Amino acid sequence: MPCIMQGFIERPKKVEQGIDFDRKLYIVRRVFEQSADDTYVASLSSRTIAYKGMFLVDQLRLFFPDLQDPDYDSAIALVHSRFSTNTNPSWERAHPNRFIVHNGEINTIRGNADKMLAREETMESSHLKNQLHKILPVVDTRGSDSAMLDNTLEFLVMSGMPLPLAVMITIPEPWTNNKTLDQDERDFYQYYATMMEPWDCLLYTSPSP
């Protein structure tokens, strides 16, 4: 069993709460992850906490004391339980990820991951600015297919894109032969298809501001 530690980071007064603080934490986490091979950060956010492990659902509350505290409160909780089918099970690969839970396999994963990595030379973000190089590579190819999609969504959101838009781009509805779409919807999907290949049903949530 891994050694599990929990820490709390105080928000600097000059940093706004919410996504601005989370963006700083994202950069800190990526720098730490790349400096320590045998560690995994389940979550580092001012708005969400991810509890994960190789458990049955009813064992989760027994393992983490936080979840037994009657004063512990949350607006929403996502729970996922499924054994690995195409990767070896491990604590860090357990769901939830930081943005999504996903029940299934992404058949296009290798192509999606390779193309995300290939784009890194031309990536830029007005929100990450000169910190962008610290979070590369965007996709950790050692993770599961779901984790790699989670990496991509997290990067898009931290770069300033609203989560619903990021999801519509990465996981578009079947639009090519859909005659019910109006021209604006068709133009939307066609435009973003030039920038992002579709990933394969997902459950995701955006934390409260």
Residue ranges and their predicted role:
Residues 71-106:
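Internal mixed beta-strand/loop scaffold within catalytic domains of large alpha/beta enzymes
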Residues 93-139:
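Extended active-site and interfacial segments that coordinate phosphate-rich ligands
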